[in-house]
Amino acid sequence: MKVAVITPTIGNPKLVDALASVDRQTYTDLTHYIFIDGKEYVKPVESMLEGASKVKTVVLEENVGKGWYGHRVFAACSFLVNADIICYLDEDNWFEDCHIEKLVKKIQDGYDWAYSLRKIYDKDGNFLCEDNCESLGKWPVYFNNEVHHIDTSSFAVKRDCAVRIGHAWYGQWGADRQFFSNLSKHFPKFDCTNAHTSCYRLDGNPNSVTKEFFDKGNEVMQERYGDNLPWKNPQRLHQIEIGPGIKLVQ
C-alpha cells in the first residue's frame, strides 16, 4: 500500500526534523508531500529540502493557512495525491522510525483507518513524557469522559475514506477534534497501534498545552487504571470499582 505523508509548511525551521523522520521510516513505499503555503515561503522551504529523498512539493500561490493552521491543505490533499493511505504531519512534529509501518500493518488487518499514540517533547526536542491522558482515541481524555481526541500527526486514513470525509478538516484550532468526530462516526472500523510513535512538540503558542497539563493528566490516569493502561496493554481487561461490589470492565 502506497502512503502519502502530508505536511503544510511556511518554513518553520523545525521542518527539518519532520523531513528527516519521514526519510528514516522503516516502511519505504511512501511519498512526503510538502505543501508550501504561499509562494513567499518557497525559498526558505527549499533550503531545507536538500537531501530529503521522499519529497514532492506543491506550491500554493496564496497562503491558505492564515499564519499556522494547515487544515485547509489537509482538507484538500486527499484529492491531489496518488496513494492508498494518507498520514498527516504538522511541520513542527515528527515520527518514530516505525510509525508508518505500524499504522499500515493495522490497516492491513482490515481497518479503514488507524492511529498511534504520541510522545511529548519540549520546543527544543527534549523528551518530556508519553501522552497517556489526552490523544487516546478510543479512550476519553482525563478531564472529561465524554471527550475523545486524536492529534493530527497520529492519523493514518485510507484515501478513499479521506476523500469522503476530508471536508471535516476545514476549520482553525480544534480541527483535528472535529475530523476525528466525523471520521469515527462515518468510518467506525478503526484501531490503535498501541505504540507512542508520533512525536509532539510543545511550542508555547497561546493554544498549546503545557508540560504541567500532561503531568497532571498522566497522574490522574495512573490513579484510574493503575499499571494496566488499556491503550498500552490491549489484551488486558481493566476493572474499575464504581460501587460496593460493582465493577466496570474496560
What residue ranges belong to the model's regions?
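N-proximal low-complexity "stem/linker" segments adjacent to membrane-targeting elements
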Residues: 1-21
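Short, acidic, metal-binding catalytic loop of nucleotide-sugar glycosyltransferases
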Residues: 20-29
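Active-site donor/metal-binding and catalytic loop motifs
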Residues: 119-126, 153, 193-224
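Active-site-proximal specificity loops/subdomain of glycosyltransferases
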Residues: 44-80
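Short beta-strand/loop segment that forms part of the nucleotide-sugar
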Residues: 30-41, 58-62
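Acidic donor-binding loop at a coil-to-helix junction in glycosyltransferase catalytic cores
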Residues: 172-179
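Conserved donor NDP-sugar-binding/catalytic core segment of glycosyltransferases
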Residues: 101-129
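Short beta-strand-to-loop acidic/aromatic patch adjacent to the donor-nucleotide binding site
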Residues: 83-94
